[in-house]
Amino acid sequence: MKRIDAIIKPSKLDDVKAGIHALGVTGLTVFEVKGYGRQKGHTEMYRGTEYTVEFLPKIMLSVIVVEDLVEPVVKAITDSARTGKIGDGKIFVTSLDDVIRIRTGERGRDAI
């Protein structure tokens, strides 16, 4: 089992969700986060004064999948989230030792 975390632009959430759902993945956790990468924020003008916005609003989504779905899910996320501009985001894939469904006690693949 793998955990796929993706940090994307908020405007791309619906597209990414649809792409993942089309693969038959039904579980998804979404977080509203703030951060910066290489772009290190940006400056904005407000009432004639320039302000530096260090942390940009992003969406982080997390999905747990079996090994066979890792590459299709990564492709669905990249295809749906890519604009070709700085700030499109990152994807992190990590190994997962176990998953436990609290309600039933099911473990592993049965708990996904």
What are these regions (language model features)?
Residues 1-112:
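Positively charged, small/polar-rich N-terminal and surface patches that mediate targeting and assembly
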